[in-house]
């Protein structure tokens, strides 16, 4: 079992809270297994040292990160790639719980560790992490099956009311992307210029030709959060049967 971006953001408190949930289940069910916990949060002083050394670069059109930005941040995390997951797998972990992670990692790490093509494993992971939005009708809360092969992978929905088409799977390249042909991530980018989407059956699509292009240096994305205000929730109720009716 691999869990990434624990708690939805992957900061240290979210990881620790998720560890607590797992420990509670373990105690209730009397389970025994080896678990690896991977943190992704950085201390502020470490990040500021990297700024001073010129090791932090702007991501796209955003402004340069300043030390004042770091001071105002509550949490700063880095989006890890599959490498820490693979290391945990090699250590014999049965359950891996990680902080902020590149979304495909939970699907690609095991495959890459077993020698499958990195580009195809990551591309399949990018599709699977979005659930069934690549199917017709699309859904973010339904299941997809991915089958990774030597030179391709096949995706198909598990719900009989849905189907994958070459167009619906290819269209996923447009989802939350600035460029549908180049999908950057930790340590490099997926190159989809030569990717092919082949309709195998009414519900199955085979994907091939995707390449992984590593960057000269290994970069990870930093994400931070700062307090901008407070939110108050004030629930109210009434017992008046006339008003309720």
Give residue ranges: language-model regions.
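Gly/Ser/Thr-rich loops at beta-strand to alpha-helix junctions
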Residues: 6-16, 100-106
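Flexible, glycine/proline-enriched loop segments at strand-loop-helix junctions
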Residues: 6-12, 67-77, 113-114
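A glycine- and small-aliphatic-rich helix-loop capping segment at beta-alpha/alpha-beta transitions
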Residues: 16-28, 52-57, 110-121
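Terminal amphipathic helices with adjacent charged low-complexity linkers/tails
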Residues: 21-38, 43
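An acidic, phosphate/nucleotide-engaging active-site surface
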Residues: 43-98
């Amino acid at each position: 079992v691999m869990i990434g971006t624990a708690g939805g953001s992957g900061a240290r408190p979210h990881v620790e809270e998720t560890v607590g949930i797992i420990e509670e289940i373990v105690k209730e069910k009397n389970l025994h297994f080896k678990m690896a916990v991977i943190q992704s949060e950085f201390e502020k002083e470490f990040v500021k040292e990297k700024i001073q050394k010129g090791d932090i670069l702007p991501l796209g059109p955003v402004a340069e990160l300043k030390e004042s930005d770091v001071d105002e941040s509550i949490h700063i995390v880095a989006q890890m790639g599959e490498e820490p997951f693979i290391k945990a797998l090699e250590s014999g972990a049965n359950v891996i719980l990680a902080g902020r992670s590149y979304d495909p990692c939970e699907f690609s790490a095991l495959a890459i560790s077993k020698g499958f093509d990195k580009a195809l494993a990551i591309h399949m992971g990018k599709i699977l992490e979005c659930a069934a939005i690549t199917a017709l009708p699309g859904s973010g809360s339904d299941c997809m099956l991915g089958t990774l092969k030597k030179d391709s992978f096949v995706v198909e929905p598990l719900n009989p009311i849905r189907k994958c088409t070459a167009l619906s799977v290819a269209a996923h390249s447009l989802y939350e992307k600035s460029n549908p042909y180049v999908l950057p991530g930790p340590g490099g980018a997926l190159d989809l210029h030569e990717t092919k989407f082949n309709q195998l059956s009414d519900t199955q699509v085979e994907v091939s030709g995707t390449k992984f292009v590593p960057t000269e240096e290994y970069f990870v994305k930093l994400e931070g959060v700062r307090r901008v205000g407070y939110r108050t929730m004030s629930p109210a109720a009434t017992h008046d049967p006339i008003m309720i009716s």
